[in-house]
Curated annotation (Swiss-Prot):
The modification 4-aspartylphosphate is found at D56. The keyword Acyltransferase does not apply. This is Transcriptional regulatory protein DcuR. Residues 181-200 bind DNA. Its main location: cytoplasm. Phosphorylated and activated by DcuS. GO terms for cellular component: cytoplasm.
C-alpha cells in the first residue's frame, strides 16, 4: 500500500481528502496533520514511511511552502502534491522549484484528484523499473507521451468505439440526468469496471463533469453529467 499524509488545518477538508484517498485502490491515508510541526513529527519520526504528502498552502498561522525546503534539505524521499486555493504565480513557481509532483487548485474535480495520485504512482513505478532509459522512454515518463504527440481523444487500448457509442447515446438521451457508474452500467448492460474506464476517459476529454456525493452511510458516490459547452463532442461519439 502507498502511505499518504494529509496536511491541512481545515478538519472538514482533510476528511474529504482522506475519503478521496480511500476510494483509490492501493492508497491509504496513514495520518493527518493540522500544523507543520505535527507533519514533521509524522514524516521524520513515524515507524510508517510516508510515500506521498498532500500539502495545503494557506494555513491559519503557517505557510505550507515552508515545509518544502525542510524536506529538500533533509533529502526526504516523500513526494509532495500541493492541494491549495493558492493560484498565484509566485506560489506555484516556488512549489515547482522544490519539486512538487503535481498541483491541484481548490476546488477541484474528483477525477483530477484521482488522476494526480494514479499518475504519480505510474511514474514512480516506471522509475523503479529500469536502471537506464532511451529518449522515447524518458519522453513517456516526463511528458506522458512519446515525442510523436497523439490525439488526446483517441480511445486507449481496451476501449471500443461500439461500446463508447452505446454509452454516449444513452447519455445523450438523458441530458438533464446526473448518473452514477452503477446506474449507467446497468442501463447499457456492461460491467461496472468497464463502464468506469469509459467515464474517466469522457471526463478527461471534458465531455462529462464529475462530482462526489455522500449517502447515509457516508460512502462516496461519483456522479456524472454532460458539460453543456462540450455537448457537440458527445454528439460526435453518438454516430
Amino acid at each position: 500500500m502507498i502511505n499518504v499524509l494529509i496536511i491541512d488545518d481545515d478538519a472538514m477538508v482533510a476528511e474529504l481528502n482522506r475519503r478521496y484517498v480511500a476510494q483509490i485502490p492501493g492508497f491509504q491515508c496513514c495520518g493527518t496533520a493540522s500544523t507543520l510541526e505535527k507533519a514533521k513529527e509524522i514524516i521524520f519520526n513515524s515507524d510508517t514511511p510516508i510515500d506521498l504528502i498532500l500539502l495545503d498552502i494557506y494555513m491559519q498561522k503557517e505557510n505550507g511552502l515552508d515545509l518544502l525546503p525542510v524536506l529538500h534539505n533533509a533529502r526526504c524521499k516523500s513526494d509532495v502534491i500541493v492541494i491549495s486555493s493558492a493560484a498565484d504565480a509566485v506560489t506555484i513557481k516556488d512549489s515547482l522549484h522544490y519539486g512538487v509532483v503535481d498541483y491541484l487548485i481548490k476546488p477541484f474535480q474528483a477525477s483530477r484528484f484521482e488522476e494526480a495520485l494514479t499518475g504519480w504512482r505510474q511514474k514512480k513505478m516506471a522509475l523503479e523499473k529500469h536502471q537506464y532509459y532511451d529518449q522515447a522512454e524518458l519522453d513517456q515518463l516526463i511528458h506522458g507521451s512519446s515525442s510523436n504527440e497523439q490525439d488526446p481523444r483517441r480511445l486507449p487500448k481496451g476501449l471500443t468505439p461500439q461500446t463508447l457509442r452505446t454509452l454516449c447515446q444513452w447519455i445523450d438521451a438523458h441530458q438533464d440526468y446526473e448518473f452514477s457508474t452503477d446506474e449507467l452500467a446497468n442501463e447499457v448492460n456492461i460491467s461496472r469496471v468497464s463502464c468506469r474506464k469509459y467515464l474517466i476517459w469522457l471526463v478527461n476529454c471534458h465531455i462529462l463533469f464529475t462530482s462526489i456525493h455522500y449517502g447515509v452511510t457516508g460512502r462516496p458516490v461519483y456522479r456524472y453529467r454532460i458539460q453543456a459547452e462540450h455537448y457537440s463532442l458527445l454528439k460526435q461519439y453518438c454516430q
